[in-house]
Amino acid sequence: MSQYVDLGKMPESPEERRNLIEQRVTMEDYVSHLEITHIQRRVLEFLILQKGYTQEDIEVNKEFKVQLGDISFDVMADVVLKVDGKRFLVIKCAINSLDSWERHSVAFCRVVDTYRIPYAVITDGDQARMLDALSGQLLTEGLDTIPSREKAQQIVREVNFSPLPNDKHEREKRILHAFDAIKCPATPTGLDQT
């Protein structure tokens, strides 16, 4: 009995079919070795199979250290897209309430690197909201609106990767730190466990 395998598109030739199957097997092998959520898995499959990104273009669970005065804290990006040596898009995988993560994602993109990462996406694996992290404005909605690798290369050539002005840097770090402080604990606390 044969099994249906989603190749992302209908192959136009036996050679293309072989290439798509090879790409799918490579992606499955890559994803199977990562400690990721089901949403991250769906996003990675989409990026690799539908948008043409390679493993080298994708950083998963990437940690960044942020210094805020005397406080140092770590923040993590669920998925980062990096093309031609530049991080240009950060993806936040959220279970629900995508719009509640917009401000966090914008602050994240503005302060975690030596330059402002220009775009942020918040997704639950089905829906997505893409933001211009420089202005904070919503650009598009829908997973399909994430740029392809080819389009990303064009974006990277056209965008000015400049740092956030110093007078705004501390404010964005404080916003990021506030979101970091309200994370839910991994285990229940304060509950009577008898």
Where in the sequence are the language-model features?
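Short beta-alpha junction loops
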Residues: 123-128
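A short, conserved, highly charged catalytic patch centered on acidic carboxylates
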Residues: 2-118, 129, 134-194
